[in-house]
Regions:
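N-terminal secretory signal peptides
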Residues: 1-23
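N-terminal export leaders
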Residues: 23-41
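C-terminal segment of N-terminal export signals and the immediately downstream linker at the start
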Residues: 42-79, 236-237, 245-252
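Conserved short histidine dyad/triad with adjacent acidic residue
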Residues: 125-139
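Short beta-strand His + acidic residue motifs that chelate non-heme Fe in jelly-roll/DSBH
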Residues: 135-138, 156-157, 194, 200-206
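Glycine- and acidic-residue-biased ligand/ion/polar-headgroup-sensing regions
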Residues: 142-144, 148-157
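Short acidic-glycine-tyrosine-enriched beta hairpin
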Residues: 163-196
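Double-stranded beta-helix
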Residues: 201-252
Length: 252
């Protein structure tokens, strides 16, 4: 297509242009095609064993993830995004079949969840989710969590506090506001994350075929009390800004 276009706008001419100029330009246009043909004939390049894109084993994933968590434990939350990005990259390089599992079967109804890997301060928590099963919206103690869809499809939603709120241990029904920051569909190999600074509440609903979800959590506090499910109002207070009224529901 490019060559035909070149012929149309710059035909050979005998009106003072140096001989061969048009021909040279046409040949240059063929170069990318030639390179592409050579690449196809040779096949895709092999990924070197020490490449940043080489597959990782389960042990390599765990070793690198834990080292990052130990280092971040000494740093401030301004480094959380870097940790999340590193963990996402490590997970992307690890075949889904090599990821840790708690071995529980997917139930016909509801979900089967629990820790599948403990590498303190890191922990993988796996959820086998029946079709339509829900992990209710909840917050977390200070942590960075990357959630991976390993099988099926799952709808993820993230929220943040909008304004002041009582402590999540205060279960007196007091209302406060939260803002929905993200809503996305995850398929196998896709991730979503939150840090201490953003998107700190999340919830999930499995698709029609169910799902396998793995949370890769890096805990940055010994605090185990600041966990609570969150109850949302039936309708948002502000549809455009995705602001909802909410209350803490405790751990059950």
């Amino acid at each position: 297509m490019n060559v035909d276009h070149e012929r149309a706008v710059a035909p050979d001419n005998d009106h003072g242009r140096e001989p061969g100029v048009t021909i040279a330009r046409r040949r240059l246009l063929w170069l990318p095609v030639a390179f592409a043909g050579a690449a196809l004939s040779q096949g895709a390049p092999a990924v070197a064993a020490n490449s940043a894109f080489a597959p990782l084993s389960r042990d390599e994933l765990g070793e690198r993830w834990r080292a990052l968590g130990v280092e971040l434990d000494l740093l401030t939350d301004e480094h959380d995004e870097s940790l999340a990005a590193h963990v996402v990259a490590l997970i992307a390089r690890t075949p889904l079949a090599a990821l840790p599992t708690h071995g529980k079967a997917r139930p016909a109804v509801g979900l089967a969840g629990g820790p599948s890997w403990q590498l303190l301060p890191c922990m993988a928590i796996e959820f086998q989710m029946a079709p339509g099963a829900e992990i209710r919206l909840h917050n977390h103690p200070p942590s960075v969590v990357v959630s991976l869809c390993a099988e099926g499809e799952v709808r993820a939603r993230h929220f943040e506090l909008h304004g002041d709120a009582p402590p999540c241990t205060q279960l007196d029904g007091q209302r406060f506001e939260v803002q929905e920051t993200r809503s996305l569909l995850l398929r196998p190999g896709q991730t979503t994350s939150f840090t201490r600074r953003r998107d700190g509440m999340h919830g999930f609903v499995a698709g029609d075929a169910g799902a396998r979800l793995i949370d890769f959590a890096t805990f940055l506090s010994d605090d185990g009390e600041t966990f609570s499910y969150v109850t949302l109002s039936d309708e948002p207070l502000d549809e455009e800004r995705r602001i909802w009224e909410a209350s803490w529901a405790g751990k059950k």
